Amino acid sequence: MVQGFRYFNVYGKWMHLRGNRANAIYKWREQARKQGYIEVWENAEHIFRDWTYVGDICQLQLDFMTTVVGSGIWNVGSGLPHSFLDIAEAIAEQEGVEIRTIPMPENEKSRFRHKTCADLKHLKATIGKRKWLNVYEWIDLEA
């Protein structure tokens, strides 16, 4: 039996351990606290991510280990993408800072995906519908 999982934009505690590879949520919170403002790329309102809480992923993995027999590949995400700008605005409002727009780096333009969203049909068919922590709830918890 082989089970594979595609994780979509994982967030949660310990993101600082990823260094430069930390996600935007962590980076924006750090910018707000250290710089007093948040930098987002131009057109951030058109960049969407399916943010997935690491705690939900851990629970899903435990459920798979105890209930799912069989092989497959499953997408793991909330299925609800949110724009970079919406997330940055939520953090900026909490931290009481402004958002500054910067150009997207040239090295990102050709390889950057503007939208990610997990197709959860196979996951739901295998293990049923799940309640995922909404990214805005996490942002509120981490304030």
What does each of the following model-derived ranges do?
Residues M1-W14, E39, I99:
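Conserved beta-loop-beta element that borders a ligand/cofactor-binding pocket
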